[in-house]
Amino acid sequence: MYWFKNAMIYKLTKELDWSEDKLQQNLAQCAYHPCGQSDMSKFGWTTPLRGAELFCFSVGKQILLVAHKEEKIIPAHVIKRELDNRINELEEKENRKLKKTEKQALKDDVVSVLLPRAFSKNQQTAIWIDTEKNLIYVDAASSKRAEDVLALLRKSLGSLPVVPLAFANEPSMVMTDWIIKNDMPQWLVPLEEAELKAADDRGIIRCKNQALDSEEMISHLQAGKFVTKLALEWEEHLTFVLNDDGTLKRLKFADMIREKNDDILKEDFAQRFDADFILMTGELAKLTENLIEHFGGEKNRL
């Protein structure tokens, strides 16, 4: 099962048709196929459930998709060495300096020769679509990776009206108040790791194994710095780092959560996958609901 390690959350701004047949048909048009000899990269959908034919896995109103990206890796120094050799040989043979366009043509030829022998880097990115709350969760640590996967989904569906989930109250202001006023919600526990920034972004303090209510930390906050990242534990169910943009990084589910379905036999892979997906999405949905409520609800957009 794809236990999310990060969660970049997006809000759908209008209802879409998530019927399984239509979704499967749309995703199949952008299915992942391995790189051929002349391909530098391939990007498309793969089946979430091993051995299945569907590109979407759904339970109730929750849908799981998995994007697969394959990139051929040719070290830059290998290309440069081969290209330099070819340029030197040709310039010596023709007794002249090659033009820029000629060098580019040689480089393209070098890459095409090296491609069939290049190693592949494979990367999978999971997307969970909560069609009940109109939220999309992307298991990505960077906005670039998340946006790439959303672009693939948009291409598959023809339209994907989404915006990053935003709160009415700025997370950095709320997290700063938590520390200064020692007023953490009962369902959260701080984990002695944080990042503080000045309003002008010029000063950054990163701390680990540091009591957040220490005089040193409080003085930084009283001097005008804000909490922009904060490591937290939620209900003893999972730990994560909350960022000032509302994203959740370094998600780690507690053993007692991950082991809840251990009574299901390993041979029943599909049943365990199903149960774990229900479990994970249920936990993250509750956490998201807690955060939205505590941060004053979702931000109204004009």
From Swiss-Prot:
State whether keyword Cytoplasm applies. yes
Does the record's keyword annotation contain Cytoplasm? yes
Which BP terms does GO give this entry? DNA recombination; regulation of DNA recombination
Checking InterPro entries in the record gives:
RdgC (IPR007476)
What are the protein's UniProt keywords? Cytoplasm, DNA recombination
The cellular location(s) given in this protein's UniProt record come to:
Cytoplasm, Nucleoid
MF (Gene Ontology): double-stranded DNA binding
Major location (coarse): cytoplasm
Pfam families per record: RdgC
Give any Gene Ontology cellular component: bacterial nucleoid
Extract the PANTHER family matched here.
RECOMBINATION-ASSOCIATED PROTEIN RDGC
What protein family does this chain belong to? Answer: Belongs to the RdgC family.
Q: Please name the HAMAP family in this protein's record.
A: RdgC
As for what it does, the entry says:
May be involved in recombination.
| Protein's name in the database | Recombination-associated protein RdgC
This chain's source organism reads Mannheimia succiniciproducens (strain KCTC 0769BP / MBEL55E)
Q: Which gene encodes it?
A: rdgC
